[in-house]
Design a protein with these regions (language model features):
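Short beta-strand/loop element within the Bergerat-fold HATPase_c
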Residues: 63-73
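Conserved glycine-rich
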Residues: 123-124
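Short alpha-helical Gxxx[C/S/T] motif in the catalytic ATP-binding
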Residues: 110, 114
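Short helix-loop "hinge" at the ATP-lid/N-box region of the Bergerat-fold HATPase_c
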Residues: 52-57
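Conserved catalytic submotifs in the C-terminal HATPase_c
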Residues: 24-35
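Short conserved segment of the HATPase_c
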Residues: 86-98
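Detector for a conserved hydrophobic position within an alpha-helical segment of the HATPase_c
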Residues: 117-119
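Acidic ATP/Mg2+-coordinating residue in the GHKL
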Residues: 81
Length: 145
């Protein structure tokens, strides 16, 4: 693994997502200039989550909001959408191998890979409800020394 600048990785993936989707991607606040220990798969983590936020979105105007929060030793990236959300019973299951939305296309490997990579980086990933609707995926990563 190597030390990576989080804002660079995130900015590149957001640029690709904006180019590839008819959706609104907003960054709330500023992305702190922090470094994390990861590898090039960190890009895949954000790409998967940004793509999912649009692909599984049933809204006429998909909106995805990214925000980043940091403290002394970790950073949390939140990717929030205005889609159908994730039922409570599936919030842990969706990161399992081969799990996918009830009626959504795809191999179901996306979130499992996200979970696997984030765990390799010493981090954590989980999902909560967005308000008033949608899902928020949280990616927590330890800061590089």
């Amino acid at each position: 693994s190597e030390v990576m600048v989080l804002s660079h990785v995130l900015a590149a993936e957001l640029e690709d997502a904006r180019a590839g989707h008819n959706a609104e991607f907003t960054v709330e606040g500023t992305v702190p200039d922090v470094r994390v220990t990861a590898n090039e798969m960190l890009s895949s983590v954000f790409r998967n989550l940004l793509n999912n936020a649009v692909q599984h979105n049933d809204s006429d105007h998909p909106e995805v909001t990214v925000s980043v929060d940091t403290d002394e030793d970790r950073v949390v990236v939140d990717i929030a959408d205005n889609g159908p959300g994730v039922p409570d019973g599936q919030k842990t299951d969706i990161f399992g191998k081969g799990e996918r939305g009830i009626d959504s296309p795809g191999t179901g490997l996306g979130l499992h890979l996200v979970y696997t990579f984030v765990e390799q980086f010493g981090g954590d990933v989980w999902v909560t409800d967005n308000d008033p609707r949608g899902a928020v995926f949280h990616v927590e990563l330890p800061l590089a020394e």
